[in-house]
UniProtKB/Swiss-Prot annotation:
Family classification: Belongs to the IlvD/Edd family.
Subunit-structure text: Homodimer.
The protein's name in its UniProt record: Dihydroxy-acid dehydratase
GO terms assigned for molecular function: 2 iron, 2 sulfur cluster binding; dihydroxy-acid dehydratase activity; magnesium ion binding
Swiss-Prot/TrEMBL keywords: 2Fe-2S, Amino-acid biosynthesis, Branched-chain amino acid biosynthesis, Iron, Iron-sulfur, Lyase, Magnesium, Metal-binding
């Protein structure tokens, strides 16, 4: 039996804790169980969407692994906000907020009940970083387990993901497809439970869980429906008690080098821009100093080697059949891009794990490329700065064909206004659509603009217009899109001062974004600007707006460690 039961002894050992033991006997504990390590199994579960529909089932398999390793597992839930269902609605304001709430609920549950170690099972976009933030915050032995991607859909020979449905709406509004064609894509694009199928935010964060060393190597890519997904659940249950025996805790794993490796992987795969926010937040919880300047430096050296949607044509299940995330990591490791001494929850360095890992004997089929002959010669994401974003902004250049754009501002104080303009055909080639007051404090909650961006792409304007916002983008976004503009409009950032007709220049090569007006005019507008009143005076959204920091700080709500 594993001899790590230390913390839970204060809750469950001794005469004075007899009543505590009574409670656990009521849920099935035996006398022998009280001598075992208590392992929490955190399931981000919900039937309000497919992403986390099956996590309770995975929790059963995790508990099997815990039992095999000599512990006893108890399942606890956390909240889920499904981004895709809330896209373009007031509910999207709760998306990023839920990340921090998830970390808080895990801290409350597991610290209140004295667990010795835990496994976190996440599916959708915010459950994953929320769990990882909690891992480093609690610093108990812990392993992350991804719920897995949904299978791709098919329309004849065409592979479909949920991205196709979002963009089909824009195509229908532009008169390019019929309502019946839209309906057919809607019906076929998401055939199973699991997360969105491309390298959107959920699959990006799953990939980065391996790069960070918080998940078992190879565990990110098997689909939610795969038997291998359940096998990784059992293995994660065993692994967390091995980590406890070895004294491996998340703050030993999440070092500067681990965040560095995750950033390299993000840029090499053209993953979701949301990962920048989440990695900043994870680093914040770990007490690791990692800033946009670090991301910027790394991004200027790393090419894109993965042709995964939305930057390429392939889905996560396609990557899985050629070996999954380790095949990417090994390429980066052999090319000298990774820091191999970073520790993982498996108790070994990522370099040693990758040395042993061998790819399956199947061709890469254009899904992956070499570092020497990459899919794209530049990074997937660029950090921008300039007089429109003094504290930084992000641009997903890996999913755009043009890196430079200069155009005329059309300004909208919110996503709903902008979507109406796109639907009405008011957006023309050469426009820079500016959507503001959608930042962490201003919205509040920094919602994603996928409804607008997908409509723009679906209308055939993806490379003809640009979009700039203090909000966020979905990982499914493609085109010339700049987000996370900091400072945001609500706190008086320069984006609040943009007027219709202003010229804006975006340069993804040099990393600059410029509002082309004289400094004197900018100062005149600043003097005339008044902050808008808060949108909420009570409840969760008001509390969040009061606490949240800016996007360049990860939009966190807790003080620095």
């Amino acid at each position: 039996m594993v001899k790590i039961k230390v913390r839970s002894s204060a809750w469950y050992d001794g005469v004075d804790n007899a009543s505590h033991r009574s409670y656990l006997r009521a849920v099935g504990f035996t006398e022998e169980d009280f001598a075992k390590p208590l392992v929490g199994v955190l399931a981000a579960w919900s039937e309000l969407g497919p992403c986390n529909y099956h996590t309770l089932d995975l929790a059963r398999y995790v508990k099997e692994g815990v039992k095999e390793a000599g512990g006893v597992g108890l399942t606890a839930p956390t909240i889920v906000v499904n981004d895709g269902i809330n896209m373009g609605t007031p509910g999207m304001r709760y998306s990023l907020i839920s990340r921090d709430l998830i970390a808080d609920t895990i801290e409350a549950q597991f610290n209140a009940h004295g667990v010795d170690a835990w496994v976190g099972i996440g599916g959708c976009d915010k459950t994953q970083p929320g769990i990882m933030m909690a891992m480093v915050r609690l610093d108990l032995p812990a392993v992350y387990l991804y719920g897995g991607t949904a299978e791709a859909g098919w329309l004849g020979e065409r592979e479909l993901t949920i991205e196709d449905t979002f963009e089909a709406v824009g195509s229908y509004l532009a008169g390019k497809i019929t309502l019946e064609e839209l309906k057919r894509i809607e019906e076929l694009s998401f055939p199973t439970y699991g997360t969105c199928q491309g390298l959107f935010t959920a699959n990006t964060m799953a990939m980065l869980s391996e790069a960070l060393g918080l998940a078992l190597l190879g565990s990110a890519s098997p689909p939610a429906t795969s038997a291998r997904r359940r096998a990784y659940a059992v293995a994660s249950g065993r692994a967390v008690l091995k980590a406890a025996e070895l004294g491996v805790t998340p703050r030993r794993v999440v070092t500067y080098d681990a965040i560095y490796n995750a950033a390299v992987t993000l840029f090499a795969t053209a993953g979701s821009t949301n990962a920048i926010l989440h990695l900043l937040a994870i680093a914040h919880e770990a007490g690791v100093k990692f800033t946009l300047d670090d991301f910027d430096e790394i991004s200027r050296r790393v090419p894109v080697i993965a042709a995964l949607r939305p930057a390429g044509p392939y889905a996560m299940q396609d990557l899985d059949r050629i070996g999954g995330v380790p095949r990417i990591l090994k390429k980066l490791y052999k090319a000298g891009f990774l820091r191999p001494e970073a520790l993982t929850v498996e108790g070994e360095t990522i370099g040693k794990l990758l040395e042993r890992w061998q790819p399956p004997a199947v061709p890469e089929d254009g899904i992956l490329y070499s570092v020497e002959k990459p899919y794209k010669p530049y990074s997937g994401i660029r950090i921008l700065r300039g007089n429109l974003a003094p504290d930084g902004a992000v641009m997903k250049i890996g999913a755009a064909d043009k890196l430079k754009f200069e155009g005329t501002a059309k300004v909208y104080n919110g996503e709903a206004e902008a979507f109406k303009a796109v639907a009405a055909g008011e957006i023309k080639p050469g426009d820079v659509v500016v959507i503001r007051y959608e930042g962490p404090k201003g919205a509040p909650g920094m919602p994603e603009m996928l409804k607008v961006t997908a409509a723009i792409v679906g209308a055939g304007l993806g490379e003809a217009v640009a979009l700039v916002t203090d909000g966020r983008f979905s990982g499914a976004t493609r085109g010339i899109m700049v987000g996370h503009v900091a400072p945001e409009a609500a706190v008086g950032g320069p984006i609040a001062l943009v007027e219709n007709g202003d010229k804006i220049a975006i340069d993804g090569e040099t990393g600059r974004i410029t509002l082309q007006i004289p400094q004197e005019e900018l100062e005149r507008r600043r003097k005339n600007w008044t902050p808008p009143p808060p949108k909420y005076s009570g409840g969760l959204l008001a509390k969040y707006a009061a606490l949240v920091q800016q996007a360049d700080k990860g939009a966190v709500t807790t003080p620095p460690r």
